[in-house]
Amino acid sequence: WALFINWFNVPYNKKRDQAYLIRKEDLLFVKKDQKINKNFCSFVASNPSGKRLDFVPKLHSKKYVDCGGSLLNNTGKKIKGRGDQKWKIKYISNFRFNIAFENEIGHGYVTEKILHPMSVNSIPIYWGSDFVNEDFNSESFINATNYEDDEELIAEILDLETNKELYLEKLAE
């Protein structure tokens, strides 16, 4: 089992899944010949903080990014969040990449943002804790802090997008 923990101290509410369990059997593990997710990139967030406000429009100007949260929404409907994480996970399972930017950089501050896309074969584009490599395989996601600037980061994303073999190698990590 993989356990989603309510990171937000949301009081108990029968309409929300505070601890959303994902059965190990339901986690997706990529195979080289597996069909890859249908759409390019998703972004789901509500907090207008951090680097996300700058980066998402830059990537979107190069290739369409579906923004399903309340922040920068361009889908016409908002994905539930803050406890209803199963809807977010289902949504991002349709995308090859997910922008997984934390609200801020903090030592050891790693939230569900990197784990959700990994659980549904979507490569996280992560910005956040400098300790993320201690908990996750650094080859399994794109760490935005490893790039000189956003243009270099976007070039890497678009390279993976156009090269199926490279994309599948990263996804298989």
Give the ranges of each region predicted by the language model:
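Residues that scaffold, gate, or flank divalent-cation-dependent active/transport sites
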Residues: G68
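Pol beta-like nucleotidyltransferase catalytic core
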Residues: W1-Y64, N73-A100, H107-E173
